[in-house]
């Protein structure tokens, strides 16, 4: 349910012309319990198993002649603790204003990147957060760079610390985006993220180019992100100079849906710590029941860390259009040195060197309004 407040005013200078403004309050509350079994056992209550918990405001004003002024202010919530997500930022998920016109849409603020969109539930069975064989498994390249969770590195537009969807290239601060009108199912997008450091316009910035095609059954997208932050004097492993190529697609036929994607990170620093990620999944819907499965692989290159394979099965029961119960069983098979990867940060003690694989069982409920 969306709570909508509408104001309609009469434009006296233009008879029979109306300007309509609407503001909506919306959100998602998603809570789950997890049982993790690796070198040790752990029970968790977490927020955002299927979708990141959030509360937001969005509005639109019809300016006439096909022009609209829009805004979105959306903050993440850790429902298990009552705190704010995304490093404590008030509107850490999205915060932007936009002008939609017959010639395309221009927007500015904190916005999703093409990498975030392609790794989300639009193209993945387990989205890019939370439980299951999530695309958040992919990352840890180039000395710790996280292309899907959000990087803790000194990236051009990241202001928060930590690696849980805080900064670029997942969400891009100080960014401008232009999206073309749709033509024969195609639309293109360009995003620029400014580092906002005087004298370092080309040293602190992010470019994001994408192309998307959509028809009744197929949704496909390709993109390239150039993220660069080489601010003077920072250690090499805390600097960023990477290119990220991503391709994803979702195809629906009857009650079945098949989706997957590919991500390749090119580390342009001398260390050359490249990485690749793959995912392939599908679901089958029967009435209120949804059965899903997905495989995700994370493959760091030029390192001994080793690859991760995640195999996940999931089930969802829709009580209504706004509330569902979900469960999943996932195996994270980790190789190489290090402590391995799961869909989020690995809890201390869950894995140790030589014993890095983890089994996860989750049960949760999601409600949207």
Model-found features: residue ranges?
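Extracellular loop and loop/strand-boundary signature of outer-membrane beta-barrel proteins
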Residues: 40-44, 83, 162-163, 195, ...
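Outer membrane beta-barrel
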Residues: 21-35, 43-195, 203-205, 212-216
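Gram-negative bacterial Sec-dependent N-terminal signal peptides
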Residues: 1-19
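Transmembrane beta-strands of outer-membrane beta-barrel proteins
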Residues: 23-31, 65, 69-73, 106, ...
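Structural signature of outer-membrane beta-barrel channels/translocons
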Residues: 58-62, 100-102, 179-184, 212-216, ...
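Detector for outer-membrane/organellar transmembrane beta-barrel domains
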Residues: 207-318, 328-331
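Transmembrane beta-barrel outer-membrane domains
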Residues: 46-52, 88-90, 167-171, 200-206, ...
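Outer-membrane beta-barrel "beta-signal"
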Residues: 353-369
């Amino acid at each position: 349910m969306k709570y909508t407040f509408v104001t309609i005013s009469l434009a006296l200078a233009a008879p029979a012309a109306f300007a309509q403004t609407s503001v909506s309050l919306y959100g998602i509350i998603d809570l789950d319990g997890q049982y993790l079994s690796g070198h040790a056992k752990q029970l968790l209550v977490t927020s955002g198993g299927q979708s990141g918990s959030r509360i937001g405001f969005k509005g639109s004003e019809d300016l006439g002649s096909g022009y609209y002024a829009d805004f979105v202010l959306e903050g993440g919530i850790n429902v298990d603790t009552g705190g704010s997500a995304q490093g404590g930022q008030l509107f850490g998920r999205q915060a932007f204003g936009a002008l939609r016109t017959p010639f395309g849409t221009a927007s500015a603020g904190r916005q999703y990147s093409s990498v975030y969109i392609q790794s989300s539930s639009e193209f993945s069975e387990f989205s890019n957060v939370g439980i299951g064989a999530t695309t958040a498994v992919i990352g840890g390249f180039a000395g710790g760079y996280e292309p899907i969770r959000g990087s803790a590195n000194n990236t051009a537009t990241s202001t928060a610390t930590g690696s849980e969807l805080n900064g670029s290239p997942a969400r891009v601060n100080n960014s401008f985006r232009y999206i073309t009108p749709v033509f024969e199912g195609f639309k293109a997008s360009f995003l620029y993220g400014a580092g906002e450091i005087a004298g370092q316009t080309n040293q602190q910035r992010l470019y994001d180019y994408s192309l998307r095609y959509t028809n009744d059954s197929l949704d496909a997208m390709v993109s390239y992100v150039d993220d660069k932050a080489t601010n003077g004097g920072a250690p090499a492993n805390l600097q960023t100079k990477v290119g990220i190529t991503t391709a994803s697609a979702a195809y629906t036929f009857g009650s079945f849906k098949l989706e997957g994607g590919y991500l390749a990170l090119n580390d342009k620093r001398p260390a050359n710590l490249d990485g690749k990620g793959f995912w392939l999944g599908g679901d089958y819907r029967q009435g209120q029941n949804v059965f899903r499965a997905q495989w995700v692989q994370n493959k760091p290159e030029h390192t001994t860390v080793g690859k991760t394979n995640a195999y996940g099965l999931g089930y969802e029961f829709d009580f209504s259009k706004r509330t569902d119960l979900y469960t999943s069983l996932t195996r994270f098979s980790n190789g190489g040195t290090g402590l391995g990867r799961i869909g989020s940060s690995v809890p201390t003690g869950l894995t140790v060197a030589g014993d890095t694989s983890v089994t996860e069982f989750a049960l949760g409920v999601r409600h949207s309004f």
